[in-house]
């Protein structure tokens, strides 16, 4: 992210700031060249010059504050706040599904509501969009490693995100539904989308923003 924009958002006062908050899927991990192929960059091209899209993804980030890499303790959390976004797109939860991080839906809900409240409190009056995690194509096993992403837990998280969106009257972009029948998007490692997958996510976000 260009820090000139982060620390001086008023230089672009006539643009609509879109903060893409998330983990490695938002960041564009495994994509080459990452900055050109990640979904926030594709979204920027679709939205055009009236918008400034910031990629604030953090590889390995969890939504839960007790996770092994809480998003709320990252530099990009601070940068996304200083960006003064008009729109915030939240896509977290994949890394929360790991055995070492998952404490159940109640803990997840509490931290999710806190994150929503944080962005709602910004002077830019951000409109918040929730996103469900992408489908994981890793095979769950009887005795998974503690650091293994779990699709069964991701399904729990997806239901909770949809429920929170309904209760908070927030739009929700269901990326889990978008990707559940597309294993070809995740051929490299079963978790991170390839360029086609990133493009599909960008298109889905674009349609939601233009709705």
Residues of each region from the PLM?
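A short, compositionally biased domain-edge/stem linker segment
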Residues: 1-10
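Conserved SGNH/GDSL esterase-like catalytic core that processes O-acyl groups on lipids
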Residues: 11, 15-19, 25-113
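Short hydrophobic segments within beta-strands
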Residues: 21-22, 131
């Amino acid at each position: 992210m260009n820090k000139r924009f982060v620390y001086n958002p008023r230089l672009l006062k006539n643009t609509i700031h879109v903060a893409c908050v998330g983990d490695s899927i938002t960041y564009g991990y495994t994509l080459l060249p990452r900055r050109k192929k990640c979904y926030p960059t594709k979204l920027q091209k679709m939205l055009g010059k009236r918008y400034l899209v910031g990629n604030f993804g953090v590889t390995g980030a969890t939504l839960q504050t007790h996770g092994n890499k809480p998003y709320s303790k990252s530099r990009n959390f601070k940068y996304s706040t200083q960006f003064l976004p008009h729109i915030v797109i939240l896509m977290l939860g994949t890394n929360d599904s790991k055995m070492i991080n998952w404490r159940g839906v109640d803990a997840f809900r509490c931290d999710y509501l806190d994150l929503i409240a944080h962005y709602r409190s910004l002077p830019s009056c951000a409109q918040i969009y929730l996103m469900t995690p992408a489908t994981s194509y890793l095979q769950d096993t009887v005795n998974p490693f503690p650091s293994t992403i779990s699709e069964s837990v991701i399904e729990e998280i997806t239901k909770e995100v949809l429920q929170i969106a309904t209760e908070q009257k927030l739009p929700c972009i269901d990326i889990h539904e978008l990707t559940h029948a597309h294993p070809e998007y995740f051929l490299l490692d079963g978790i991170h989308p390839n360029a086609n997958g990133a493009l599909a996510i960008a298109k889905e976000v674009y349609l939601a923003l233009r709705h």
